Amino acid sequence: MSAQNLPYAPAQLAADLRALGVAPGGVVMLHASVKAVGPVLGGPNTILQSLFDVLAPSGTLLMYAGWQDLPDFLAELSPEAQAHYSAHHPPFDPATARAVRDNSVLAEFLRTWPGTRRSENPEASMVARGAQAESLTRDHPLDYGYGVGSPLARLVAARGQVLLLGSPLDRVTLLHHAESLARLRHKNVIHYTCPFLRDGRTVWLPIEDLDTGDPHDAYTFEEIVGAYLALGRGRRGRVGDANTVLLDAADLTTFAVAWLEARFGPDQ
């Protein structure tokens, strides 16, 4: 709530974002909690619009979307259940497939915003709006969707930033890119199939990736980001009511790779 005990106006959020270091022309990957920001005139749309306004005219906003209905668990099912899914599960459609709910409602708001582009890797799908949206999301590899050639790699190459808008430190999806680059003693490779529409029919294509959900070694993303911030890197502030952190994507990736290899590299 603002100092006047009123919902935040768009201009107030924009001023907070500028004070933190979000600037015109920037490429920003957002992780956000709408609830943490507090009451806002216009709700979630206003939060996104405030970011668009600050980044304009040549900036870009990026978010992780994924696919809420990703059928990556078929190998765990009975043959009968697998056959049922294979015959009837709708294919991945970048235009309509819902964003994963657990990350932020804003991902679905951004996915459906006019002018937004979406990458075509179902599990690692990203949505972006702005001047570099097309270049960030096009030709997303199906295999190793957080690695080389991914939207995350392009975020780093664009000297982009990661904005944690009331979001906890363990939500930094960019660190999956660091995991893919790091030389680690344990890298679990997983295989699954996913339905796509090809020439008017559903085709199940094989996908290979690192297991991003269950690392062998005991570490958390919160540890990595916390260690980075403890060195005085990154910027902290408030946007609305939300404790907010702004991170340099390239610098954080370099730090995270070194942090991981020092503790879990092949020689450790």
Predicted regions and their residues:
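N- or domain-start disorder-to-order transition segments that initiate the globular core
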Residues: 2-15
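N-terminal active-site beta-alpha-beta segment that forms phosphate/nucleotide-binding
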Residues: 14, 21-77
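Short, structured patches in soluble enzyme cores that scaffold and shape functional sites
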Residues: 65, 164-168
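Short, catalytically relevant binding-site loops at active-site mouths
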Residues: 68-70, 125-128, 169-172
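Internal, conserved structured core segments that host functional sites
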Residues: 74-165
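A short secondary-structure junction signal
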Residues: 121-122, 166-167, 173-179
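Gly/Ser/Thr-rich active-site loops/lids in small-molecule metabolic enzymes
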Residues: 180-206
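Acidic/aromatic/glycine-rich contiguous surface patches that form carbohydrate-binding/processing clefts
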Residues: 199-268
